[in-house]
Every structure is written in structure tokens, then in C-alpha cells.
Amino acid sequence: MKKMLLLNGSFNEVQLIHTAHRLGYYVITSGNDASGEGHKYANEFCPCDYSDKDAIYALAKQKEIDVICACSNDFGALSADFACEKLGIPGHDKYDTSRFFHEKDCFKKMAKELNLSTPAAAWFDRLEDALAYVDSLSYFPQIVKPADLSGGKGIKKVCCKKEAIDAVKDAFERSKIKRILIEEYIEGRQQGITVFVQDKKVVLEYATNDDSYVNPYMVWLACPPADNYEGIRGTIVADIEKMASAKNIADGFLTIQYIVKDGKPYYIETMRRALGNQHYLCMSKDTGVDFYELYIRSQCGESCSDLLSHAHALESYSGFMAIFAPSNGTIKSIEIDPMFQSKLFDIKMLNGPGYRVTDYLTDKIGTLYFTLQKTDLEWFNKNKRNLFRVTMA
């Protein structure tokens, strides 16, 4: 039985583990959190920091690993690609290529090189240089973000120099690699697209509207169809294929978050790792393709042509909606709209009544998974912010 090293074992990796088992792999998970839900489904757990690429490489050598699968974290993707390059394991980008898709400052450099549309930005690896740049700024707002963190961590919108100075210091403090970006603030419709690239061509695509709730830099809700997507599809697909060819990427998934302003997409960030929030469940339901199997097989360097042949146009619209509290405090009750309840195909509750929320901006209470028909879309878009209620004691 071939051995797979999967670089984490959180809730986000549970479906990956089940899929790997179904495909015949002996699964070894890593990570720092032994309590992660996914570890109990693995054949073996080896504690190892997935953000430490050298440690992951050493673990893979020690365990005589056959294939490595990145987890739903940018650090995990980088470490997986690094170890695979060193060991000659297929299915992954070169490490230096991977950095263009998982480190925000490297992405900006690639965007500039390829003339891609993205908010203007400056990037820094020294605090004093970043502060000098802030002092030279003549317009606000700006966005300050660590170059290496995902999930909205450390991102701040700043409206004056004092706010920018504080945000820059905080971003440097949070960044593991001690690099940050200061980026022009773009206001528009946030969307996301996940594509499968085969031989440098987009052969499968899935675009969503991405909404925020209380935290403007964390996706709370993602659901197709993306507004006015057909008007920008040609540009996005051409740009993805330009990136794929220029950086000679391996076959597999590529996800881009972007903002549409005045009918033009502005690319914010990219990733080639597995998505969190079990988003692949939604994509699989709508397209007829098992995205988890597609991800595992591509990470293992296997052909995916047979799976891709099952893809069909969207006939339903599935998405996830995270549940957050409106403030810090103790949860008294959680209510879900009865009509919306009838659209759910899964519910994952992490906490409930009696739980004390200490950071309502990031402390997710649970996630609702739903499927809509075309006739539901108008109702859903009108009511989506009122489909659950968290009451605090």
C-alpha cells in the first residue's frame, strides 16, 4: 500500500483523508494540533509543523513516503512542494514557482511581470522601509497585510497615516516570514474562481460570489453563480493560462480571489492548495465531478482525464454560509430560517448555546451547507444576511 503524507488533520482535511483511503492510500497526517478532527481517521499521526518545510522533508524521507498531499493552508502547500521537489515526487510545482501563488508579495511580482490586473502595491521586508513609505503616502484608504497569512489574518484597512503605522507594525509582528504588503484599496464585488488546469489550459471552472459578514477580510458566504461572470470570463481564463504557461505549473487546481470594479477583475490573491470550509463538497454537487478525488489524484501526479469527462454545466447552486456571533459574549441561542433549513444538505456546528465568544471576528460557530435551484436565487440574495440569528445572553 502506498504511503501518503497529508500535511494536516483538521476538520478541513477530513474529506481528503476519506478520499485517500478510498483510493487505496495509507494516510499519515502531520501538524502541531493533535486534537484535529482529521487525525482520528488517519492511519498514523506524526506531529510535525507543516509550516517548517525542512522538517516536512525530513519526515517524508524518514517515513519513506510515496506521495505528499498539501493541506488547506498556504504554508502546507509550500512545504509539500518543497519536499516533493527534493524527493522527486510528481504532482507538484517547484518550490520557487509555488511561492508565486502562496506568498502575496511574490504574487504581486508575478502580476507585474505578466501585466495582470491587480491593486497597486508595495512590499517590504524591513519595518523602517515600510514606515518611510507610509510617510510618503498621499491618499487613503490603503490595505496592509502580512505576505504569508491566509483567512484574513492580520489584514487591516487604514484611512490615515497613524492607522497605517499601527497596522504595519502589527503585520510585521504577525508575519512568519517578516514580509508585508501595502496595497491600494479597491471597492467592488468580491468573487472567487477555482479552476482545474491541465496542460496549462483551464478545463474546469467554478466561480462564486464571496461575501463577508462581520469580518470584511474573511469569506463568510460563497455561492455560485458569480454576478456578471460571463462578461469577465474570457479575461480571467486568459490570465490564468498566461500564469500557467509563464510559471510552468503542474496540472491541478488554482483558486483566485478577485474584486470586480467597473466591469474589470482585480486579482487579490491566489492559491493552489485545498480549499477550507469543505467547499469542494459544494463544487462536487454542482459540477458532477468529485473535487476531492480530483485534488488527491492531481497531488499524486495521476491522470485526471476520466474524472474531468464527467463535468457538466451547473444545474444547481451549492454554497457554504459560516455562522458568526454579532459580538463577544456568551451564546444564548442559534436560530435558522425554516425555509433556508429546507435547502441545507449538511450542518457542521463547532459550538452552541453556552459557548463564550472571545473574538467574534474570527471565532466561527459553525457552517451551513446548502443547495439552491435557479428559482431560489432571487429570494436567497434578498434575504441571505437574515437566514440565521445568534442571540447573545
Indicate residue ranges for each PLM-predicted region.
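Peripheral (often C-terminal) accessory segments that flank ATP-dependent C-N-forming ligase machineries
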Residues: 113, 296-393
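Conserved ATP-binding module of the ATP-grasp superfamily
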Residues: 117-119, 141-144, 155-192, 216-222, ...
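ATP-dependent carboxylate/phosphate-activation module, predominantly the ATP-grasp catalytic core
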Residues: 162, 184-249, 253, 260, ...
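ATP-binding N-terminal substructure of ATP-dependent carboxylate-amine bond-forming enzymes
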Residues: 1-95, 128, 303, 353-354, ...
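A conserved helix-loop-beta module that forms one wall/lid of the active-site cleft
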Residues: 85-154, 159
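Flexible, glycine/charged-enriched surface loops at secondary-structure junctions
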Residues: 181, 250-256, 306-311
